[in-house]
């Protein structure tokens, strides 16, 4: 039986990594996609993690204007939530024109980025695609347990090491404008996969 290809938005973190593993175990063929906007090579970490996981990986470069607008929104709103949501929704809209099955690491407990039920319905109907969020049924404690079962993890403070999520390039643009990213992004921990504990 031919496996169905699914294109997974991938940052190299535990959530997008776990999503890819779950989809593989459900019988899909995960292709990992990391989005870059040409600001800095933030995709490097995701490339390393994709090799560890053994999945196909591709970097897609989108228009820098998307993250420039996100930086404008952060300065206007004084916090990053709406901007991160805008970038994520824009990315999904663009990718939905290219791929018939999309997935990401959105969790049940996430606030942003996260599509509402009606937004998911709209995306799937307008673009005639499937949008899968494998982690939506799991809470934080469960995901932490699952990730620790499969992965060797590295935890870093946000902004201290180049990551492959949207935040990295937005932070760089804010710095280019003479703004301090720490003024807008609350301090938080980011976790990335640096090895496997068991075969996937």
From Swiss-Prot:
Q: Name the source's superkingdom.
A: Archaea
Report disulfide bridges, numbered on this chain.
Answer: none
Enumerate the InterPro entries for this protein. Answer: DUF7411 (IPR055834), Rossmann-like_a/b/a_fold (IPR014729)
Organism source for this protein? Methanocaldococcus jannaschii (strain ATCC 43067 / DSM 2661 / JAL-1 / JCM 10045 / NBRC 100440)
Return the protein name: Uncharacterized protein MJ0690
């Amino acid at each position: 039986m031919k496996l169905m290809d699914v294109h997974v938005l991938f940052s190299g973190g535990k959530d997008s990594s776990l999503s890819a593993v779950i989809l593989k175990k459900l019988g899909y063929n995960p292709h990992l996609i990391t989005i870059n906007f040409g600001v800095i090579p933030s995709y490097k970490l995701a490339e390393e993690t994709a090799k560890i996981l053994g999945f196909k990986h591709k970097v897609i470069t989108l228009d820098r204007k998307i993250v420039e607008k996100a930086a404008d929104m952060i300065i206007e709103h004084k916090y990053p939530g709406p901007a991160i949501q805008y970038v994520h929704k824009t990315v999904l809209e663009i990718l939905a024109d290219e791929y018939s099955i999309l997935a990401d690491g959105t969790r049940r407990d996430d606030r942003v980025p996260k599509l509402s039920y009606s937004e998911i319905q709209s995306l799937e109907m307008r673009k005639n695609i499937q949008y899968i969020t494998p982690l939506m049924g799991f809470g934080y404690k469960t995901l932490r347990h699952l990730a620790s079962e499969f992965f060797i993890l590295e935890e870093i403070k946000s902004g201290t090491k180049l990551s492959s999520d949207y935040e990295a390039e937005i932070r760089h643009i804010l710095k280019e404008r003479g703004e301090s990213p720490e003024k807008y992004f609350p301090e938080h921990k980011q976790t990335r996969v640096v090895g496997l504990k068991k075969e996937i």
